[in-house]
């Protein structure tokens, strides 16, 4: 019986052993070489070999079922299993190629968020197409599948409203692009501030400034305001200089000197608003407003530029013989009778 089995399926057995040998040789060859060479050709050839092996094995099993009158299984079941295995392998290979494409786009400098959303949309499309083709292959009508999908979608929607809300909000985040991975964001409505680490289908992961992970449901972003300081073009420097009242005669000169210093400062963006004006009589000081923008948006560089501006302001004030005011009170005493000398 075994001899007859081998004789009648010699071609299938040769195909199986030859395909397995080809897989082993391919794996050995690519393991010795560069892993980056596992591109479209590698996966296509590997998928073809897997398909040949599965088809040959299925053919042998069907031969055994038909010739030995096996009752516990039918050729239709074997065809279903083989087709399912081929569909799963095809899906895996396509997903691997999509992941490689996504990594290549990111390495080329493309936006991470855009690359990921395109990758996920293509994966979802592949799954839907394969399910429809798979069902049609086994005699299910396309209209029936779509009707079943609509009813199932309605049931899932009613049972998982919050999940679907997060899902569709995640899609809108990808298309509206209020922020991208790596952006610093914060919300004045909620206690949310940090760097965007990941935008998922259901939640967005934010790393706070003390390196704690914060997971925010995507649906929340549709009902709150989100500020994206990471996309600002400049950073602002604003402060108030308080001079003493006895330095009133020097205020105008100091204002002009500070304004000139800012106009010539290499870190200050001259295309943006630059204001230096005496603007307030305070209780203990004559206040000068300073308002300008740096060219950089990097926090550390902005702090260095702001420090340099402040130090130069101190030098200007002191070089003009003036000084900074501090809260003080002056007590005037008039017509005071000295106490009588004790006898």
UniProtKB/Swiss-Prot annotation:
It comes from Escherichia coli (strain K12). The chain crosses the membrane at residues 10-30, 41-61, 78-98, 126-146, 148-168. One of its GO terms (molecular function) is mechanosensitive monoatomic ion channel activity. Belongs to the MscS (TC 1.A.23) family. GO terms for biological process: cellular response to osmotic stress. The lineage of its organism: Bacteria, Pseudomonadati, Pseudomonadota, Gammaproteobacteria, Enterobacterales. This is Low conductance mechanosensitive channel YnaI. Residues 31-40, 99-125, 169-343 are cytoplasmic. It is a multi-pass membrane protein. Homoheptamer. The keyword ATP-binding does not apply. It comes from the Bacteria. Pfam families: MS_channel_1st, MS_channel_2nd, MS_channel_3rd. It is found in: Cell inner membrane. GO terms for cellular component: plasma membrane. Keywords: Cell inner membrane, Cell membrane, Ion channel, Ion transport, Membrane, Transmembrane, Transmembrane helix, Transport.
């Amino acid at each position: 019986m075994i001899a007859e089995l081998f004789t009648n399926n010699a071609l299938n057995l040769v195909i199986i052993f030859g395909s397995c040998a080809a897989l082993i040789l391919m794996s050995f060859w690519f393991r010795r070489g560069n892993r980056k060479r596992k591109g479209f050709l590698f996966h296509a050839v590997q998928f073809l070999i897997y398909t040949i092996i599965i088809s040959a094995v299925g053919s042998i099993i069907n031969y055994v079922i038909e010739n030995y009158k096996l009752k516990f299984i039918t050729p239709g079941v074997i065809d279903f299993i083989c087709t399912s295995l081929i569909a799963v392998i095809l899906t895996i290979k396509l997903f691997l190629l999509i992941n490689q494409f996504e990594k290549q786009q990111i390495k080329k400098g493309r936006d991470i968020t855009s690359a990921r959303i395109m990758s996920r949309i293509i994966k979802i499309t592949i799954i839907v197409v394969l399910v429809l083709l798979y069902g049609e292959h086994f005699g299910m009508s396309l209209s029936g599948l779509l009707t079943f999908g609509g009813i199932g979608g309605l049931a899932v929607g009613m049972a998982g409203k919050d999940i679907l809300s997060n899902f569709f909000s995640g899609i809108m985040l990808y298309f509206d692009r209020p922020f991208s991975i790596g952006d610093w964001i914060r919300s004045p409505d909620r206690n949310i501030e940090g760097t965007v680490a990941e935008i998922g289908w259901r939640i967005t992961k934010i790393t706070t400034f003390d390196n704690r992970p914060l997971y925010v449901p995507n649906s929340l972003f549709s009902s709150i305001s989100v500020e994206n300081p990471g996309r600002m073009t400049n950073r602002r420097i604003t402060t108030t200089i308080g001079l003493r009242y006895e330095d009133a005669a020097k205020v105008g000169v100091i204002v002009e000197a500070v304004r000139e210093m800012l106009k010539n400062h290499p870190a200050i963006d001259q295309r943006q608003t630059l204001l230096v004006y005496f603007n307030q009589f305070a209780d203990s000081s004559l206040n000068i407003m300073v308002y300008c923008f740096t060219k950089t948006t990097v926090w550390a560089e902005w702090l260095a530029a702001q420090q340099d501006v402040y130090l130069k302001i101190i030098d200007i004030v002191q070089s003009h013989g003036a000084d900074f005011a501090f809260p003080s009170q002056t007590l005037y005493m008039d017509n005071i009778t000295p106490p009588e000398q004790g006898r």
